[in-house]
């Protein structure tokens, strides 16, 4: 809790712990979801288990290898690139803060508590953000959103009524649980009513009505 107040004091420029509590109340009153503008939500990401996401280091290496030029460019590329820039910078600042706090704490138990809190709580949020934006840039936002919905449906379906393997993002069109409209065979097969041919008299009357 002392570390949390310290973070709030630094970020809010508040000189006292009481002021940090005021900052905390202000933050709790705001309904900020970093995925809303991209069509997703924190709840949708929460269906994926924590061990699904790679480590922050692996995700940062992937972002650097694939999109370093775009991330370092002064030009605006996409909202996902902008979000990735902010996530990378925030993670760097968080690591600097954690290092500073860990260095200035004399108690080893407190230092271990700081490292554990950052890795367990804040680390997961950063892993989710990095994975989401990298995946959207790699596979496309629509496919990633479809995957999240498909995985959510799969994980909430009882094991006896769902496929044994979870959906895989790279092969989603073949294994997805929730399919888009127009992809099923039934929609491609015309109904018996459509196959019936209309008589010339009926077609003639319909053409006259359309002219009117």
UniProtKB/Swiss-Prot annotation:
Chain segments carrying region 3 X 8 AA repeats of S-P-R-R-R-R-S-Q: 184-206
GO molecular-function terms, A-Z: DNA binding; RNA binding; structural molecule activity
Ranges of compositional bias, category Basic residues: 180-205
Domain of life: Viruses
Signal peptide stretch: 1-19
Subcellular localization, as worded in the UniProt entry: Secreted; Host nucleus
GO biological process, one term: viral penetration into host nucleus
Propeptide: 184-212
Family annotation (InterPro entries): Hepatitis_B_virus_capsid_N (IPR013195), Hepatitis_core (IPR002006), Viral_capsid_core_dom_sf_HBV (IPR036459)
Alphabetical keyword list: Disulfide bond, Host nucleus, Host-virus interaction, Repeat, Secreted, Signal, Viral immunoevasion
GO cellular component: extracellular region; host cell; host cell cytoplasm; host cell nucleus; T=4 icosahedral viral capsid
Sequence repeats: 184-190, 191-198, 199-206
Region (HBEAG) residue spans: 25-27
Database matches in SUPFAM superfamilies: Hepatitis B viral capsid (hbcag) (SSF47852)
Family to which this protein belongs: Belongs to the orthohepadnavirus precore antigen family.
Subunit details: Homodimerizes.
Function statement: May regulate immune response to the intracellular capsid in acting as a T-cell tolerogen, by having an immunoregulatory effect which prevents destruction of infected cells by cytotoxic T-cells. This immune regulation may predispose to chronicity during perinatal infections and prevent severe liver injury during adult infections.
Name of this protein: External core antigen
Organism: Hepatitis B virus genotype D subtype ayw (isolate Australia/AustKW/1991)
Source lineage: Viruses, Riboviria, Pararnavirae, Artverviricota, Revtraviricetes
Designated gene of the protein: C
